[in-house]
Amino acid sequence: MEFKHISVLLNECLDALDIKDNGIYVDCTLGGAGHSSHILERLSNEGLLIGIDQDRDALKAAKERLKRFENVKYVHSNFYDIDNILQNLDIPKVDGILMDLGVSSYQLDEGARGFSYMKDAPLDMRMNRDNDFSAYEIVNEYSEDELYKIIRNYGEERFAKRISNCIVNRRSDKPIETTMELVDIIKAAIPAKARREGPHPAKRTFQAIRIEVNSELKILNQTIEDGVNRLKPGGRMAIITFHSLEDRIVKLKFRELNDPCTCPREFPMCICGKKPSVRLISRKGIEPTKEEVEENPRSRSAKLRIIEKL
């Protein structure tokens, strides 16, 4: 199957990175190389792109798409390891870092990966298939309380209690092995009126399990800090999020880096000594245009936030 992924907020990202032709840029989520191909077109031979992805299929597709470019380094890893990756490449500082936190169209559409609640597949959801831990372990081995907490916290699902209870009851008969088995359980747990009126009933639960499988939110705060430490003064970091949990983490971390002062508000001046390390380029998240959403409905929930290293 062709690795296809329509780049979201493409022009906005390119503008955000303020690309220098001899700069060093890191695409932390290389995917199908949509953003990266355009970054490379703006680089001279003196510039460099470092593409990171934990999905070997994505790296293979990216290498094929970018084969005409020689100034690319490919890294099979999770972007949370950005500090070690740059250290191993002997690159102390970079000019820009891009993170696109969305699941690719390929991962959603490729049945065998188990990301989609629209296609039957084994319960998997691993971004990095070298890892042993998958959705199967979560669904079949987590306690009811553990399931409830991740579905509520990571999926913001109001019927988390009912869903977790139904999962535990059903798996007592036999293991839950496929996405469609899980979808049927979720549908049975959600009241008919809510199923009719809201988004797909399995959407939030699948999001929650995917986040847990890949530790997506746990690594984000530290990754932002490590990335900012690797930026040159004037270097930019641009992050695209696709749901409110991710966006909240990015927004709060950016604000903290922009205003780290911990002094009580009533103090007339700062005495804690903490100085800003970045400035906010976008106070609010940049959203796709109406035209982009019409062309690519999956971009609807995207938000882009940008900071610049001081």
Swiss-Prot record:
Family annotation (SUPFAM superfamilies): Putative methyltransferase TM0872, insert domain, S-adenosyl-L-methionine-dependent methyltransferases
Gene Ontology CC: one annotated term: cytoplasm
Top-level taxon of the source organism: Bacteria
Binding site for S-adenosyl-L-methionine: 33-35, 53, 79, 100, 107
EC number(s) reported in the record: 2.1.1.199
Catalytic activity: cytidine(1402) in 16S rRNA + S-adenosyl-L-methionine = N(4)-methylcytidine(1402) in 16S rRNA + S-adenosyl-L-homocysteine + H(+)
Enzyme class: transferase
GO BP, sorted A to Z: rRNA base methylation
Keywords: Cytoplasm, Methyltransferase, rRNA processing, S-adenosyl-L-methionine, Transferase
GO molecular function: rRNA (cytosine-N4-)-methyltransferase activity
Location relative to the cell: Cytoplasm
Disulfide bond positions: none
TM spans (from-to): none
Protein's UniProt keywords contain Nucleotidyltransferase: no
Keyword Methyltransferase among UniProt keywords: yes
Function comment: Specifically methylates the N4 position of cytidine in position 1402 (C1402) of 16S rRNA.
Family under the similarity heading: Belongs to the methyltransferase superfamily. RsmH family.
PANTHER family: 12S RRNA N4-METHYLCYTIDINE METHYLTRANSFERASE, S-ADENOSYL-METHYLTRANSFERASE MRAW
Protein name: Ribosomal RNA small subunit methyltransferase H
Name of the coding gene: rsmH
